[in-house]
Structures are given as structure tokens and as C-alpha cells.
Amino acid sequence: MQQVKHLLAAKGNAVYAVAPDAAVYDALQQMADKNVGALAVIRGDELVGIISERDYARKVVLKDRSSRETPVSEIMTPGVVTIGPDASVDDCMRLCTDNRLRHLPVLDGGRVVGMVSIGDLVKATISEQRETINQLESYIVG
């Protein structure tokens, strides 16, 4: 069973983050530039929240607010569910499903060391299942 640390090693463990006092517009620009759907919100070295495209849609667009004038802290999701690098992909899938999450920050010693998305987890699961199928087919064929 694959662990998060292996997933991060394969996909890269770049941490895309924004400060809580940054404008939502700047966070959106960074998400677009990095082709990601969420950013960690970090104050100093501490994870204080997460901001996603969904937060923007629901808390800025639908409320007719300005992304240039709204700080990230006003729309971010605080109290983020996190995982450690030794967590299994299955545990992450369960957390995402149970909590209706699309992104999980990875913390090691209280420091953000990466982020996994539900898409990353699905790809890893499919890859692992494909490998199992290939092994079984090889065994059957001889």
C-alpha cells in the first residue's frame, strides 16, 4: 500500500502557499500560474487554513465581493484536516470522502511538506490496481 511520502516523491512536494493577509486575487493568480485548485494559508511557519477555488466561488463571487479587496483570511477554511507523510493513500481517500475534501496538506513535524489532491489519490490507486492486475495476469499465464 502506497504511502503519501512516496506519492509526494513521485509528483513533487512543492508547497504552494499564501499569507492570510494577501488579496484573494493574488491567491487566484498563483493557483492559475501553478495549475492547482488550492493553496495552503501559512502565517510564519504555521498552517492556519486552506483556500480553494470553491472558497472563491462561494464566498466572493456569489456574494458579489471584490477579489482584489478581500483578504484570504476572510474566505479561507480554517481548522484544516491534515495528514502525515507516513499515511496510506487509502487513509487519505477515507479522510477526503468522510470530510468531503479535495485537498489534504501534508504535515511533518508541524511543517507543511506537501499537498495531495483527490486527483492525486485516484491516480495512485488506479496505478496500484493496474500493477496488481499485471502481476495476477503474469501469474496466471505463467
Predicted regions and their residues:
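Tandem CBS (Cystathionine beta-synthase) repeat/Bateman regulatory domains
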Residues: M1-G142
